[in-house]
Amino acid sequence: MEIGFTFLDEIVHGVRWDAKYATWDNFTGKPVDGYEVNRIVGTYELAESLLKAKELAATQGYGLLLWDGYRPKRAVNCFMQWAAQPENNLTKESYYPNIDRTEMISKGYVASKSSHSRGSAIDLTLYRLDTGELVPMGSRFDFMDERSHHAANGISCNEAQNRRRLRSIMENSGFEAYSLEWWHYVLRDEPYPNSYFDFPVK
């Protein structure tokens, strides 16, 4: 592990996670380069702010489920290479039904340099503490469509309210939202704003 980084569950005790890119359940359809274990890594500063967010969410009856944190540069390169491949339709319906995979970059869903590689970005959602069920957000994680935008039309009032709740929790815990993805937040005062790391998650 790089100095300054930690497994988030070692700091944010009791947090739930499902490291999608370590599994077959992601838009590439297979585990992604650089993810060798199903755990989530981030900077210590990210972990401390997430702990604050977890505590704030709990006062409202919610918990945090994490999908991705630190992302090795090799994983980003894997995304870029995948986006350049001919369409095979294996994941299109589930993740990008209304665009071509070649448009993922131009539309802002995939970037050649990711804030995740700096170690202080997080992808997450809320779940109800009383039932353990994920709250409805109007689209799935990594759904590359306008429906995933914070200002999306066509989602229910409850889904919009849930997005606002997550955003309020995160912004009050030191994070900034990304307008195109309701699940993506970056630490406002990140410790390595100009560094992109490539050590594997293991």
From Swiss-Prot:
Activity regulation behaviour: Inhibited by aminoalkyl phosphinate analogs.
Binding-site positions, Zn(2+): 116, 123, 184
Domain of life of the native organism: Bacteria
Cofactor, free-text remark: Binds 1 zinc ion per subunit. Can also be activated by other divalent cations such as iron, cobalt, or nickel.
NCBIfam families: dipept_VanX
Role, per record: Catalyzes hydrolysis of the D-alanyl-D-alanine dipeptide.
An MF annotation (GO) of this entry: metallopeptidase activity
UniProt miscellaneous comment: Does not hydrolyze D-Ala-D-lactate, which remains intact for subsequent incorporation into peptidoglycan precursors. Production of precursors ending in D-Ala-D-lactate instead of D-Ala-D-Ala decreases affinity of vancomycin for the peptidoglycan chain and leads to vancomycin resistance.
Record-annotated active site: 181 (proton donor/acceptor)
Enzyme class: hydrolase
Subunit organization: Homodimer.
Family, similarity comment: Belongs to the peptidase M15D family.
GO biological process, one term: response to antibiotic
pH dependence: Optimum pH is 7-9.
Name of the protein in its database record: D-alanyl-D-alanine dipeptidase
Induction info: By vancomycin, mediated by VanS/VanR.
InterPro entries from the UniProt entry: A_A_dipeptidase (IPR000755), Hedgehog_sig/DD-Pept_Zn-bd_sf (IPR009045)
Residues flagged as site, Transition state stabilizer: 71
Cofactor: Zn(2+); Fe(2+); Co(2+); Ni(2+)
This enzyme's EC code(s): 3.4.13.22
Keyword terms: Antibiotic resistance, Cell wall biogenesis/degradation, Dipeptidase, Hydrolase, Metal-binding, Metalloprotease, Plasmid, Protease, Zinc
Signal peptide: none
Catalytic activity: D-alanyl-D-alanine + H2O = 2 D-alanine
